Amino acid sequence: MRVAMTKPLFAWDCLEDSPSLGTVREFLQSVPDEALLGSLRAWRGKGRDDYPVGVLWGTLLVSIVLRHPTMEGCLGELGRNAGLRRLIGIETEEQVPKAWNMSRFLDVLGSEPHRTLLEGVFDRMVRTLAETVPDLGRVTAGDATGLRARRLRAKRGGDEDLPVPAGGRKEYTDDEGKVTKVVEWFGYKLHLLVDVKHEVVLAWRISSANAADNDELPEVLARAQKNLPKDRIDSLAYDKACDDGAIHELLDDADIKPVIHNRSMWKDELERMLPGHDGRSNIVHDEAGTVYCYDKVSREPVRHPMAYIGHEQARRTIKYRCPARHEGWTCPSDQRCNAGKTYGKTVRVPRDIDLRRFPPIPRATKKFERLYKGRTAVERVNARFKVFWGADDGNVVGARRFHAHVGAVLIVHLGLATLLAAAPRREGTLGKMRLGPIAKALRAKLGLKQ
């Protein structure tokens, strides 16, 4: 890979459409699959070994790395490309596996205990990156996307622990609640937790197409926390699908700042009196938790958003100040509100009143909007899975095969992310190739050539 020095650490736009043999070799070397291959060999036992499990596993990974739309296309290239064959342990053209061998291998890979070990490969790769990249996982975002799949024609035992493909439907509405767009698919839902800055997946989970996002997020978050150093996650952005009281309590217990827009549930009310204030107070809040003060001295009451000062973690309160004093303009109610106060009127809102309504980062702040825009990172990751690596092609039949295939795609995602971070950087057109400190550390951990 040729990556310029000015590119970010994970330069996804520098991915090669057709990776070189050197890139494929380094990718295969970066995948910690010893335990998985050992389990597969033990499962095979003394049976026929015409196509070793290492060859089948390497063929699966290479088919995704080289972006073949079908397995037959990858097998055809292996038959023609002797150099590529040798990378995965195939000496002759006759030793290239057949399409049905790969289909059976996917079925085995998606069964226990191999499926858990496959997920363990992903977890180890995340931990390696998290130990080397100090800010990986600090600012995160989550989302779910639909993936097309096909169901087996005949029922069989062994898939009871896996969700089966089902019909999914998602409606998009405008501000008035009218449906503007409907997306339907048959298959599964893929739930991701992604680092916003680096666009690297930290944890994932496959569920039924009609599963609710707020039901799946706790398990995805727990897996991400295991993969990252303690207290690494600072904030988590999600759409309204996770605007749930239980989710806010979960994030509060983990000391993670939620960046989640709230659902509109008030029918006729526009504002309410802040709890703890009576009818003589001029402090109110809207459904999103934005705090306002009323100027009651003017002929007609005028509502002003109060100035957000910060989150007081020790007190578990959100501090607001008189907007006129904070921003330097004159308010007719200054004498009434701020008499004898140099700093101006101060309001502290206890978050425990309603964790969902009053998050540590109020929704009306620029910081909230900036962090909420980080959700686009998940959409870009979803696009790579679907368009670049073909996870949404719908060519995989059966729950076991689908889970194995998606797990392999995620391993390819992390493997190529690791190579991007470990790639030498080019200083200008005629400049030398240099390794940064993170690249040196990664290459040393993976045993790659310095």
Predicted regions and their residues:
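Charged, often Cys/His-bearing segments associated with DNA-binding zinc-finger transcription factors
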Residues: M1-S39, A421-Q450
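Basic, short loop/linker segments at the boundary and entry of helix-turn-helix/winged-helix-like folds
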Residues: D17, L21-L66, N101
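Short, positively charged, Gly/Tyr-enriched micro-motifs
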Residues: D49-G120, N395, R400-H403
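Catalytic-loop motifs flanking and including active-site residues across diverse enzymes
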Residues: V55-G58, N101, D213-E216, A377, ...
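Short amphipathic alpha-helical "interface-anchor" segments enriched in bulky aromatics
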Residues: G79, R272-E312, R351-V397
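Polybasic low-complexity intrinsically disordered regions
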Residues: M102-D268
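Long, low-complexity, polar/charged, intrinsically disordered or flexibly structured peripheral segments
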Residues: R315-P360
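Basic, amphipathic alpha-helical segments enriched in Lys/Arg and hydrophobic/aromatic residues
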Residues: F368-Q450
